[in-house]
């Protein structure tokens, strides 16, 4: 299953994020999203990029807000939303990933008979968000320590919702932390829910639906409800980067 989810690009010396993502097999990404509801980008970020991003967590001027999960019943741990201007790496991921994912999102909407279509450029989609009062950037850094976890949830911040998002693991499993698996659940009509545990290496990203996805059944296309979270961290410290493409009110 892991091999089916993981899509590797061609390795080059010190590639940029744009060239690294261009080398990914996006047809395989789309096939994995259709089959499993998620797909792994590998490589996504270099170890140096991971370390640099994680190190910004304590730099207050880079963020617009901080959330302690236990105060809101979200789980244990904390996260911080970046302020504008976004870090160069985060902005590059958002603008480079969006066109690839918009094509998949439009295909899903067409299959489901939904009228909504997403523009080709992320700037045009953000303009729609901003006209609706969604002006706050949503990319975020998450930090988990021993015993921390993230309850199953959906990242919806207003009327305009881009249906796919990406999480990058910045820490090294085993070396930096144990436990803390990324978990997806799929609630299917008149059926038991299905869970998917997604194993990630440092620098890899997982693409997954924000709230639902179309699935082909014996009677045609139906919609399944999706949630995501993180299992309990057994030891160490775990950092992740969340790339959400719609802005918040």
Predicted regions and their residues:
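Short, conserved beta-strand element in jelly-roll/cupin
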Residues: 143-146, 159-176
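A structural signal for short, well-ordered beta-strand segments
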Residues: 139-141, 166-168, 241-245
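Histidine-centered catalytic micro-motifs
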Residues: 150-157
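Short strand-connecting beta-turns/loops that link adjacent beta-strands
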Residues: 46, 146, 235-236
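Non-heme Fe(II)/2-oxoglutarate
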Residues: 28-126
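Catalytic core of Fe(II)/2-oxoglutarate
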Residues: 162, 173, 177-249
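A short glycine-rich, His/Asp/Glu-containing loop-to-beta-strand
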Residues: 134-146
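Fe(II)/2-oxoglutarate
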Residues: 1-35
């Amino acid at each position: 299953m892991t091999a089916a989810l993981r899509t590797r690009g061609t390795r080059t010396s010190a590639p940029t994020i744009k060239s690294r993502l261009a080398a990914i097999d996006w047809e395989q990404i789309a096939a994995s999203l259709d089959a499993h509801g998620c797909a792994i980008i590998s490589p996504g970020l270099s170890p140096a990029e991971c370390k640099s991003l994680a190190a910004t967590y304590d730099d207050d001027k880079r963020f617009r807000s901080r959330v302690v999960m236990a105060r809101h019943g979200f789980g244990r741990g904390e996260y911080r939303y970046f302020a504008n201007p976004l870090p160069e790496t985060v902005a590059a991921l958002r603008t480079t990933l969006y066109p690839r994912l918009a094509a998949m999102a439009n295909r899903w909407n067409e299959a489901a008979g939904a009228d909504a279509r997403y523009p080709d450029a992320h700037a045009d989609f953000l303009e729609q968000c901003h006209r609706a009062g969604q002006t706050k950037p949503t990319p975020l850094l998450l930090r988990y320590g021993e015993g921390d976890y993230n309850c199953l949830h959906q990242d919806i911040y207003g009327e305009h919702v881009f249906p796919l998002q990406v999480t990058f693991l910045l820490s090294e499993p085993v070396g930096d932390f144990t436990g803390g698996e990324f978990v997806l659940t799929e609630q299917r009509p008149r059926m038991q829910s299905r869970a998917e545990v997604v194993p990630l290496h440092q620098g890899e990203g997982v693409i997954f639906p924000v709230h639902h996805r179309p699935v082909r059944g014996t009677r045609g296309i139906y919609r399944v409800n999706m949630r995501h979270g993180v299992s309990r961290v057994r030891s160490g410290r775990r950092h992740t980067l969340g790339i959400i493409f719609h802005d918040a009110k």
